[in-house]
């Protein structure tokens, strides 16, 4: 990148993006099972597509830990549970996207996630005016959360 801001085209419509181990990971959210995640490498001033992976529907956040486990935040709707889906690695996720190693139920409207220092940090959109006040005319969130949820991965993998 030469300037403060650069623009790069990707092959899939981003619903969430993360950077891990020198790779840009871009997932596409669909309510049905046609979701994909594509990995990209930045090389010689260009973003080069590396590989495509199948992922479960409704993915809104991606994170990786030091063991290359994949954490996906999946959510759709203000009154449906969200889930943190955990896979051993990207190959396990690609092979069986509907069969995570572990699945943790969370409140509705989970969005982006981040992994740092043994914790998963989860953002929720349920306290935004659209969901909290129902400004879109589709009702209010049943469980508005205006905090970041922290999940200690030692409670998942003791």
Task: For every predicted segment, state its role.
Residues 2-8, 46-53, 97-103:
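A short beta-strand motif characteristic of beta-propeller blades
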Residues 7-21, 55-64, 105-116:
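Repeated scaffold domains used in trafficking and secretory/extracellular systems
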Residues 21-22, 85-102, 114-117, 157:
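Flexible "stalk/tail and boundary" regions
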Residues 22-66:
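Eukaryotic tandem repeat interaction scaffolds
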Residues 24-27, 69-72, 120-122:
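Conserved beta-propeller blade signature
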Residues 32-40, 78-88, 128-155:
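Structural motif
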Residues 53-94:
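Loop/turn-rich, solvent-exposed surfaces of beta-rich toroidal or solenoidal domains
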Residues 103-117, 136-146:
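C-terminal regions of proteins
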């Amino acid at each position: 990148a030469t300037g403060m801001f650069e623009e790069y085209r990707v092959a899939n419509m981003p619903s969430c993006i993360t950077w891990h181990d020198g790779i840009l990971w871009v997932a596409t959210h669909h309510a049905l099972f046609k979701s994909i995640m594509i990995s990209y490498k930045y090389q010689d001033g260009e973003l080069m597509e590396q590989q495509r992976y199948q992922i479960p529907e409704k993915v809104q956040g991606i994170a990786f830990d030091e063991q290359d486990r994949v954490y996906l935040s999946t959510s759709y709707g203000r009154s449906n549970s969200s889930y943190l889906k955990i896979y051993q690695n990207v190959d396990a996720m690609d092979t069986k996207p509907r069969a995570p190693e572990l699945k943790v139920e969370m409140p509705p409207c989970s969005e982006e996630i981040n992994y740092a220092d043994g914790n998963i940090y989860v953002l929720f959109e349920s306290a935004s005016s659209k969901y909290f006040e129902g400004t879109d005319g589709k009702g209010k969130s049943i469980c508005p959360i205006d905090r970041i949820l922290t999940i200690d991965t030692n409670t998942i993998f003791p």
